[in-house]
């Protein structure tokens, strides 16, 4: 690691943990967790997520970011709390993505339109539409703002080639012009 920084977290039931964020190659960050209240510090575990520039002020509610490779490379945010083992645990189903590039479709796509009132409607969105990813569970769907003002859910499955994603059985590369994947 090139640098490290940490937070000491005190839980309401008297446990104390050190969350240590490390900066590694390619700006990759990760967290090691140590328990501090049992005499000698003990290693609890590793998490491939980090707080970056956020602050951890409350062990019951803090933000961590995870690198996601879903229709591009993004950092997804979830709210976490310290669980019984001392590791971060989230009740959030999906990651929120704050910074994303617009993807332009190269074919008509079957999506679920997410209505403002909470209802959902199946629709086909025409080729040439712009999609900006804003939320994903990292495994089965990506939600996007469309350039016509609507929001939609794109169902995804692990790519049939062993990498990437398929949308309706078609490789993501055949559905969009390009992706902002890192590396």
Model-derived regions: residue spans:
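Beta-loop motif signature
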Residues: 96-152, 166, 170-183
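Terminal domain-start segments
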Residues: 1-2, 183
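Short aromatic loop motif centered on NTY/YTY
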Residues: 5-8, 16-32, 40-118
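Solvent-exposed strand-loop boundary residues in beta-sheet-rich modules
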Residues: 37-40, 148
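Ordered hydrophobic segments in well-structured contexts
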Residues: 6-10, 15-21, 28-35, 130-133, ...
């Amino acid at each position: 690691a090139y640098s490290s920084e940490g937070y000491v977290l005190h839980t309401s039931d008297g446990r104390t943990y050190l969350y240590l964020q490390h900066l590694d190659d390619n700006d990759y960050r990760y967290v090691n967790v140590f328990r501090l209240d049992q005499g000698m510090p003990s290693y609890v575990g590793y998490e491939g997520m980090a707080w970056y520039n956020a602050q951890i002020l409350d062990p019951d509610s803090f933000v961590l970011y995870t690198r996601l490779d879903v229709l591009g490379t993004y950092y997804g945010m979830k709210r976490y709390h310290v669980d019984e083992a001392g590791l971060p645990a989230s009740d959030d189903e999906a990651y929120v993505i704050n910074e994303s590039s617009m993807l332009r479709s190269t074919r008509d796509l079957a999506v679920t339109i997410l209505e403002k009132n909470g209802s959902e409607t199946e629709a086909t969105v025409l080729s040439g539409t712009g999609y900006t990813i804003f939320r994903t569970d990292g495994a089965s769907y990506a939600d996007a703002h469309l350039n016509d003002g609507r929001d939609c859910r794109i169902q995804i499955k692990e790519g049939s080639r062993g990498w990437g994603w398929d949308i309706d059985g078609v490789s993501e590369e055949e559905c969009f012009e390009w992706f902002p994947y890192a590396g």
